[in-house]
Amino acid sequence: MVIRVFDQQKNTYSSFALEELSYYMNRVFKTNIELVEEKEADIFVGLVNKEDRRDHVLISLDKGKGRIESNTIVGLLIGIYRMFHEFGVVYTRPGRGHDFVPELRFEDFLDKQLSIDETASYYHRGVCIEGADSFENILDFIDWLPKIGMNSFFIQFENPYSFLKRWYEHEFNPYLNKEQFSNELVQELSDRLDKELQKRGLIHHRVGHGWTGEVLGYSSKFGWESGLSISEEKKPYVAEINGKRELFNTAPILTSLDFSNPDVADKMVEIIKDYAKKRPDVNYLHVWLSDARNNICECENCRQELVSDQYIRILNQLDSALTSEGLDTKICFLLYHELLWAPQKEKLDNPERFTMMFAPITRTFEMSYADVDFDNSIPTPKPYLRNKIILPNSLEENLSYLFEWQKTFKGDSFVYDYPLGRAHYGDLGYMKISQTIYKDVSYLSNLHLNGYISCQELRAGFPHNFPNYVMGQMLWKKTRSYEELIEEYFSALYGSNWQSVVEYLEKLSSYSSCDYFNAIGSRQNDVLANHYYIAYNLADN
């Protein structure tokens, strides 16, 4: 049998979407598709107009005839995957080979009635690359994102050199020999990944840290490279700390600048503007400062104000430069380290240009935003002490800084969070971290945040990928039941005995600690030591 399909768009994006439709029609129903004109079609695939920028999916099906429509390119792809999910397909982890696909008859397709009209709960729904990754790891993950309802991918730095290098040179694995690796290879792989993002219509985030190093003449593509020194001519640009101007811990990416020096802002703005001109494919360009704390300039001029006030002035200067070039690139600015403290004087002149990103990197993951007593437990933000800050673990203190920023900025924003960046290693069953993600995402709108980007290892999937699955599903529809998600995912992954597997995983999680792994709390903990001993013995019981 053949399903006749009309492609309204007839472009690169819709062509890929139809390839996916064809693949899953064949895999689920052993049925091919044929492209025809609209009047002959069984299935109409196309775009609709909708003022809401959030992805909106419309799916109708009755007696083998219907429509798959969306207001966005990536939404159209999400809609196709969503339709097959209604037939029992579960996208359990990155890579086609990990899809759970039931074997159905063509008659099952003809008998199905669908009427789905859904708008994503949040606009920002994505992941930022971390870890050690092969090209295939990254591509599989990008391919997985719309299958679980996500619409964004963030490649840190100019290209993913740092993450590919860790994989191909096996930096942390002495048992494997280095593979062929070069700057030219990285750029080739990076260009290929950009095309994969584009053909799926995924929202493209880029760079982040590295601009401070660029001002000093070091490329952001090399990430956290260290062991370097600064020339005398560049020292006036570098933050003065303890009377000296040197690279912080010998790493450009960790080095802050003297933002009272007007040449610093001019150079940074020019570099960012030139990058934006060359990369119109980047939807959200992240402009962050250094990736270290307690490294802020102590010169007489810088001591007169907060670094966040200096940051806002640079962002306003950047906005003017981009506007003069006719560039509509969105700029993400960061609440992180010293920038957690809100500016005292400056405000953004053009809020529409900017998206605020709240990054509570030292937060606890033993509780959720939804667990906070907002009426009684949010403290007054601590006063800023230059180069003596201690970042908070508590959600209450972290949120106190966010709320101060929200008094000065009412525009678009999202949380940039880290459950799968480090904390997940402390959860042996991956169930406690999954529930924290579930509750966090369900509560974001109460914090006036319009989504979530997960800063994470892409290969965070042991013993399963339920944390990311929950993340994607909840960002798409925040009212979903946690119990429903558990059954949907684990019954596909483990079959009829899934409940006993989940029971074991939940026990593992209950006897382990994300915070302990993240160095939160005492290193000597007799209770936790006993819990780990119990977890160790669970495998034999």
Residue ranges and their predicted role:
Residues 33-57, 67:
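Short, well-ordered secondary-structure micro-motifs within conserved domains or adaptor modules
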Residues 2, 8, 12-20, 24, ...:
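Feature activates predominantly on carbohydrate-active enzymes
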